[in-house]
Every structure is written in C-alpha cells, then in structure tokens.
Curated annotation (Swiss-Prot):
It holds the Pfam family TNF. It comes from Macaca mulatta (Rhesus macaque). Cytokine that in its homotrimeric form binds to TNFRSF1A/TNFR1, TNFRSF1B/TNFBR and TNFRSF14/HVEM. In its heterotrimeric form with LTB binds to TNFRSF3/LTBR. Lymphotoxin is produced by lymphocytes and is cytotoxic for a wide range of tumor cells in vitro and in vivo. Its main location: secreted. Keywords: Cytokine, Glycoprotein, Membrane, Secreted, Signal. The gene is LTA. Residues 63-205 form the THD domain. CDD domains: TNF. This is Lymphotoxin-alpha.
Length: 205
C-alpha cells in the first residue's frame, strides 16, 4: 500500500506546472502591495485604476505655501495667495498677513524682495537709504516676534544711473503647529512688486 505522503507527492509531481503557478499567484495576490487596486476598497481601487496620477498625488502632498506681494499696495507689503503663481496647499492658511503652520515638522522657509530707485539730482544732497527684510516667527513658546531670516543694506544712490538691489534668504526650521510666519521690511516705497521679485513661502520637508 502506498504511504499517504508519497501519494500526495506523486499527485503534485503529476500536476501541470501552469496550474501550480496559478495557485501560487492566487495565494499571494491578497497580500500584494503596490499593485493598482490591491488592498483598497472597491471605490478607491476603481479611482486608482482610472486616475493613477491623481491617486499618487493625493498620497504625497505636503504642506506648502507661496505668496506674492500685492502690487496695488504701494506703502505696505501685503501678501496674497490664490493668484498668479501663489498658492496655499495642504493646511497652510494666511491670516493677518501671516502664514499659519498646519502641522509640526521641519519646514524650509524662504523670501525675496527687490528694491529699486532713481539717480539723485546733481542739485540735491544724496541721502543714504537703509533697506532691510526679515522673516519672523511668533509662537506659543516665544510670545514675541523672533527673527528667523534677515538681510540689511545701506544704499547710496548714484548720480548717473538708477540702482537695483535684491535680498534673498532661506533655511530649514523646526516649526510647531500653530506657529505664525510673517515679514518686516524697511524701504517699502522702493519695492519692485511683481510675482517674480517679491515673494514669501514655506514647505514641509
């Protein structure tokens, strides 16, 4: 009489290879990861199959914001979003001209301003101009505005040609949910307000 284990082995050996592979595939499929639609609800799986790029984008979005200066405000630097190339993404909000940090983490914070002016008249006495731009942090840990990034420059207008100066700075900071990011600028009447010259933003790393 043939032992049961030998009988089972003989049946396996006699099974066509393609049937064995099919059975193995059916066992592995429920635990497969990274395949479109696997491990998702029926509606989510259908969305992933129909719009794979959209599904990937929703799973990788991080908090980010990019603001530009409002050119209609000549005597103040007012930030605006949702216009031109400015935006608020994944929790960032703009309130009282400050960015509100949506979640705790490490963020890259950046800002740029560009100043310009005319040459002075030969009959006038040239007056040096003080230009400065600063990104500030206000949080529950520091109940006052703490400078994060700052630049300063003294400009001496020339006699022959107009002048132009830019300031850019950016760095990574550990921020807490609810922190407020704002700016302070000296020399606002000389700002060149356009989307490519005056901007302020942050994004999660």
């Amino acid at each position: 009489m043939t032992p049961p284990e030998r009988l089972f082995l003989s049946r396996v050996r006699g099974t066509p290879l393609h049937l064995l592979l099919l059975g193995l595939l059916l066992v592995l499929l429920p635990g497969a990861q990274g395949l479109p639609g696997v491990g998702l609800t029926p509606s989510a799986a259908q969305t992933a199959r129909q719009h794979p790029k959209m599904h990937l984008a929703h799973s990788t979005l991080k908090p980010a914001a990019h603001l530009i200066g409002d050119p209609s405000k000549q005597n103040s630097l007012l930030w605006r979003a949702n216009t031109d190339r400015a935006f608020l993404q994944d929790g960032f909000s703009l309130s009282n001209n400050s960015l509100l940090v949506p979640t705790s983490g490490i963020y890259f914070v950046y800002s740029q301003v560009v100043f310009s002016g005319k040459a002075y008249s030969p009959k006038a006495t040239p007056t040096p101009l003080y230009l400065a731009h600063e990104v500030q942090l206000f949080s529950s840990q520091y109940p006052f505005h703490v400078p994060l990034l700052s630049s300063q420059k003294m400009v001496y207008p020339g006699l022959q040609e107009p002048w132009l100066h830019s300031m850019y700075h950016g760095a990574a900071f550990q921020l807490t949910q609810g922190d407020q990011l704002s700016t302070h600028t000296d020399g606002i009447p000389h700002l060149v307000l356009s989307p490519s010259t005056v901007f302020f933003g942050a994004f999660a790393l």
